[in-house]
């Protein structure tokens, strides 16, 4: 007897249909309508066919949140190991020490990189991490206003709005100056007794490295400082912990995660130790086992939804654990020297890009140092023409910030992969198009 | 099975001493950056790639996985994931595309997303789908925002979300995030929503009722049509938590049951390795009258090409950066076409058969409360045995099987929540039952000494919380 028959036999029923007898006939479904099963090799054939309709061989000058960076093959190898890839949330820590230690190491690596006290391991992406940071600020001080730079992209603002909608928090934009940096006077005039947090970005939405963020802690009064940073840039730029950030957040895709058409991503969130009990998401702590051996375990779970339900600090359940492993192994392989090199090459290539475009009369919008996204004055929409020539790039600032005053602003992005040969190809293409 | 998990005295990565082997040959001068912007010190480890790989390989051997053995815990559907789904998501043409690429350079990706939207509509009998939410709970939050915007648009001030006491913890947490007050309704003696209590809870303040069906006790809410009537008569919306959808593929659907909003947990119901906790994907589907409220973009097809549609009139906007967890969407898409109608229906049939078979094997030994016929999962209580669920769970680990979810749902004392899934054989179920029955023969002292075949033994969780060490 086959296993199904013998199980049916044991239950004393004739078919599995009888196990659904509690579902009223009035809500029964006739058929799904997907069709017949497809053999595995045919699924792969179909997938490869569709994948071939996507262009991946083009020169990539796109960025503004997702970046085409060098990923050591070992990172992909490590996250593909089935013991990481197909394990569950470590609710049973005794059999999950590998995952737990890897997350603990991620928390430590990011805390060191950001110079912050603690880091969680749960945010979906940078944008939702910003939303969670705003909610956390509200939990900390109960104030109702949050200030963000006018260079914040509409999509990021939209996510933030949704996250604070239920709290009725007000979001207010502050101005940027002619260098594309924070207008300190404008920001200062907006900070009042009801300001929960000031959000700063470095590099900011214009791609500019903004040293004015280093001065915000002096003017922020009782409000909290939330810094949104580029984790790669921290290989050379001052870390958020050094300029008084209370919460520091980032999009972690650049740390060993492929572009994947924009998802899944990794939201990074670090914060001061004082605020740990107000923080969202999961935390892994070190302890000992019954024999006194070092062991890791999920901790402060009493803040989480499965225990606190309506009073939880977030609703996070499935999260980005595997991607923390990618980021942890990426940072471990690059080390300080590797990350510094990647960051410096990014700045060098951005500079080369600006100089080369400058040579054909395409000027930068801001006379400031940019990290990877550089904003140029180009009235024409060049994106589709460039795509015909095998080049991806030329996002208009107005497609990211609809009512921006820099209507000619067009982005080209450089990473450590953007060498002179690629820049030359872009210059040649633009010369023809413009 | 004789089980023994590997243990290494593995140092943390920072304490591994070797030399960095990462290299990029192009030279760059540090003076490119002004001193005032520069960081002074950076203290990441400097380790060779081979030592990093060895480190993580040793860690991996101290980690249980569904590829080593069964993972029969409730409410999170840890089934074997077919390997072709991973292969699909690893194809270069899918991995290496940028979200801002012109639409004509990503037609294949948009095609897959469009097809997945269509499949999810068919499976759920709903009218429109947004693939954007990044996880199940993110889908819940999205659904709650849609509820909020819908009533704001209608000019109605509704402040409460009703939730059963057996619900997943994410439900009340998501409702609260949206600014609603949570009203809990109790279960009746059969483990279903108490209709009288529901009627009493519903009012002009009710915005929605959130429920999963089958519920977390593995019981199908047979009064679902009556529930829908009560909620709709009050002018409120009915929200379906899709966490347990894999129990009803092809048998019934949220749309047929009268739900207005659904989220899917693609990573549970279809195919995605669980990644030690994620990533997941939590698309949201709605009935047509709510389509305009969905997060944007959704994917449209005009007969020739696919495009991202941002033009939904009353959209809540965005809940994440781009278009959702694309690589997870790919896995779900490939799993759905691989299985087709018959395969998906078989998934449910076998999951429910496995659950009822195991339940029957255990019911002579453990108290299994509430309505007898279960769906994909069931909850037993160890209270009648005098043993603690936690202790039995630790003994199970020693036998090479992952423990059930313990102490959930909160309405069952000493709960163990078991979901075998469709990918567990009869032989594994028999063995699992034997282990659970054997556990009862052990003394309390013996049980408390478990586990001992695992990498580490029972961990001092109080110390972890008291002497908080979250960083090396």
From Swiss-Prot, chain A:
Keyword Oxidoreductase: yes
Stretches of the chain forming a coiled coil according to its record: none
Similarity comment: family membership: Belongs to the GcvP family. N-terminal subunit subfamily.
Intrachain S-S bonds: none
Keyword Oxidoreductase carried by entry: yes
Its job: The glycine cleavage system catalyzes the degradation of glycine. The P protein binds the alpha-amino group of glycine through its pyridoxal phosphate cofactor; CO(2) is released and the remaining methylamine moiety is then transferred to the lipoamide cofactor of the H protein.
Catalysed reactions, as listed in the record: N(6)-[(R)-lipoyl]-L-lysyl-[glycine-cleavage complex H protein] + glycine + H(+) = N(6)-[(R)-S(8)-aminomethyldihydrolipoyl]-L-lysyl-[glycine-cleavage complex H protein] + CO2
Pfam families reported in the protein's UniProt record: GDC-P
GO MF annotations in UniProt: glycine dehydrogenase (decarboxylating) activity
Protein source organism: Thermoplasma volcanium (strain ATCC 51530 / DSM 4299 / JCM 9571 / NBRC 15438 / GSS1)
Annotated protein name in UniProt: Probable glycine dehydrogenase (decarboxylating) subunit 1
A GO biological process held by the record: glycine decarboxylation via glycine cleavage system
Keyword entries, A-Z: Oxidoreductase
SUBUNIT field: The glycine cleavage system is composed of four proteins: P, T, L and H. In this organism, the P 'protein' is a heterodimer of two subunits.
Source species, domain of life: Archaea
EC number(s) stated in the UniProt entry for this protein: 1.4.4.2
UniProtKB/Swiss-Prot annotation, chain B:
Entry-linked Gene3D superfamilies: 6.20.440.10, Aspartate Aminotransferase, domain 1 (3.90.1150.10), Type I PLP-dependent aspartate aminotransferase-like (Major domain) (3.40.640.10)
Coiled coil: none
EC number(s) on file: 1.4.4.2
Pfam families hit by this protein: Aminotran_5 (PF00266), GcvP2_C (PF21478)
Annotated TM spans: none
Enzyme class at the top of the EC tree: oxidoreductase
Example of a GO cellular component annotation carried by this entry: cytosol
Essential cofactor(s): pyridoxal 5'-phosphate
Record-stated family: Belongs to the GcvP family. C-terminal subunit subfamily.
PANTHER family: GLYCINE DEHYDROGENASE (DECARBOXYLATING), MITOCHONDRIAL, GLYCINE DEHYDROGENASE, DECARBOXYLATING
Name used for this protein in its record: Probable glycine dehydrogenase (decarboxylating) subunit 2
Organism expressing this protein natively: Thermoplasma volcanium (strain ATCC 51530 / DSM 4299 / JCM 9571 / NBRC 15438 / GSS1)
Gene that encodes it: gcvPB
């Amino acid at each position: 007897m086959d296993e199904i028959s013998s199980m049916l036999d044991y239950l004393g029923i004739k078919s599995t249909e009888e196990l659904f007898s509690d579902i009223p006939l009035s809500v029964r479904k006739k058929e799904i309508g997907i069709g017949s099963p497809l053999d595995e090799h045919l699924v792969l054939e179909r997938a490869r066919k569709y994948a071939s309709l996507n262009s991946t061989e083009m020169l990539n000058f796109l960025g503004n949140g997702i970046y085409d960076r060098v990923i050591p093959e070992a990172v992909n190898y490590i996250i593909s190991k089935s013991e990481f890839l197909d394990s569950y949330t470590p609710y049973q820590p005794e059999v999950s020490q590998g995952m737990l230690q890897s997350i603990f190491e991620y928390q430590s690596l990011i805390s060191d990189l950001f110079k912050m006290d603690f880091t969680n391991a749960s945010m979906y992406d940078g944008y939702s991490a910003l939303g969670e940071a705003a909610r956390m600020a509200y939990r900390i001080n109960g104030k109702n206003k949050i200030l963000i730079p006018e260079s914040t992209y509409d999509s990021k603002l939209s996510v933030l709005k949704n996250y604070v909608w239920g709290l009725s928090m007000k979001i207010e934009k502050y101005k940027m100056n002619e260098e594309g940096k924070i207008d300190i006077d404008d920001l200062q005039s907006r900070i009042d007794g009801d300001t929960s947090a000031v959000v700063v970005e470095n590099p900011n939405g214009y791609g500019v490295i903004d040293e004015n963020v280093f001065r915000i802690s002096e003017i922020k009064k009782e409000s909290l400082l939330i810094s949104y940073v580029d984790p790669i840039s921290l290989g050379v730029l001052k870390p958020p912990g050094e300029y008084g950030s209370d919460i520091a957040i980032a999009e972690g895709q650049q740390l060993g995660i492929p572009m994947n058409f924009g998802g899944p991503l990794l939201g990074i969130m670090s914060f001061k130790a004082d605020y740990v009990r107000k923080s969202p998401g999961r935390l892994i702590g070190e302890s000992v086992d019954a024999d006194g051996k070092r062991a890791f375990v999920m901790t402060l779970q009493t803040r989480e939804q499965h225990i606190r339900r309506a009073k939880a600090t977030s609703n996070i359940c499935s999260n980005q654990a595997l991607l923390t492993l990618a980021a942890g192994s990426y940072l471990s392989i690059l080390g300080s020297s590797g990350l510094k090199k990647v960051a410096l090459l990014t700045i060098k290539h951005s500079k080369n890009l600006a100089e080369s475009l400058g040579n054909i009369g395409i000027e930068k919008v801001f006379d400031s140092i940019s990290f990877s996204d550089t904003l140029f004055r180009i009235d024409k929409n060049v994106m589709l023409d460039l795509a015909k020539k095998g080049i991806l790039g030329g996002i208009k600032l107005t497609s990211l910030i609809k009512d921006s005053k820099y209507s000619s602003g067009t982005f080209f992005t450089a990473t450590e992969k953007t060498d002179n040969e690629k820049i030359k190809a872009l210059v040649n293409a633009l010369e023809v198009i413009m | 099975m004789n089980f023994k998990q590997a243990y290494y005295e593995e140092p943390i990565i920072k304490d591994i001493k070797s030399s960095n082997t990462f290299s990029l040959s192009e030279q760059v001068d540090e003076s490119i950056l002004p001193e005032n912007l520069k960081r002074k010190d950076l203290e990441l480890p400097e380790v060779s790639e081979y030592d990093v790989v060895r480190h993580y390989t040793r860690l991996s051997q101290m980690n249980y996985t569904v590829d080593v053995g069964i993972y029969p815990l409730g409410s999170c559907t840890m089934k074997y994931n077919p390997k072709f789904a991973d292969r699909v998501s690893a194809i270069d043409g899918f991995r290496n595309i940028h979200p801002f690429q012109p639409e004509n350079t990503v037609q294949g990706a948009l095609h897959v997303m469009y097809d997945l939207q269509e499949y999810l509509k068919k499976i759920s009998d709903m009218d429109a789908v947004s693939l954007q939410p990044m996880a199940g709970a993110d889908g819940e939050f999205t659904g709650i925002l849609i509820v909020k915007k819908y009533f704001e648009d209608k000019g109605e001030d509704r402040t409460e979300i009703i939730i059963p006491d057996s619900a997943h913890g994410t439900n009340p947490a998501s409702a609260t995030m949206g600014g609603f007050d949570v009203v809990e309704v109790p279960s009746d003696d059969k483990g279903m929503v108490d209709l009288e209590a529901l009627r009493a809870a519903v009012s002009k303040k009710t915005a929605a009722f959130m429920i999963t069906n089958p519920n977390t006790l593995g019981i199908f809410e047979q009064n679902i049509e009556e529930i829908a009537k009560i909620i709709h008569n009050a002018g409120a919306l009915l929200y379906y938590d899709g966490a347990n959808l894999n129990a009803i593929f092809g048998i019934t659907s949220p749309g047929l049951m009268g739900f207005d909003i659904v989220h899917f947990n693609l990573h549970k119901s279809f195919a995605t390795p669980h990644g030690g906790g994620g990533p997941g994907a939590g698309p949201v589907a709605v009935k047509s009258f709510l389509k305009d409220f969905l997060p944007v973009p959704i994917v449209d097809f005009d007969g020739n090409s696919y495009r991202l549609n941002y033009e939904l009139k009353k959209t809540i906007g965005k809940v994440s950066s781009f278009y959702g967890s694309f690589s997870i969407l790919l896995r779900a898409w490939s799993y759905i076409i691989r299985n087709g109608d018959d395969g998906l229906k078989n998934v449910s049939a076998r999951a429910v058969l496995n659950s009822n078979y195991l339940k029957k094997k255990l019911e002579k030994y453990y108290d299994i409360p509430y309505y007898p016929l279960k769906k994909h999962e069931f909850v037993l209580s160890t209270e009648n045995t005098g043993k603690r669920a936690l202790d039995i769970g630790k003994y199970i680990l020693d036998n090479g099987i992952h423990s059930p979810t313990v102490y959930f749902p909160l309405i069952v004392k000493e709960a163990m929540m078991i979901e075998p899934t469709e990918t567990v054989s009869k032989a594994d179920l028999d063995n699992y039952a034997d282990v659970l029955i054997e556990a009862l023969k052990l003394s309390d002292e013996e049980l408390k000494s478990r586990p001992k075949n695992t990498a580490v033994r029972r961990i001092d969780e109080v110390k972890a919380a008291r002497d908080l060490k979250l960083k090396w």
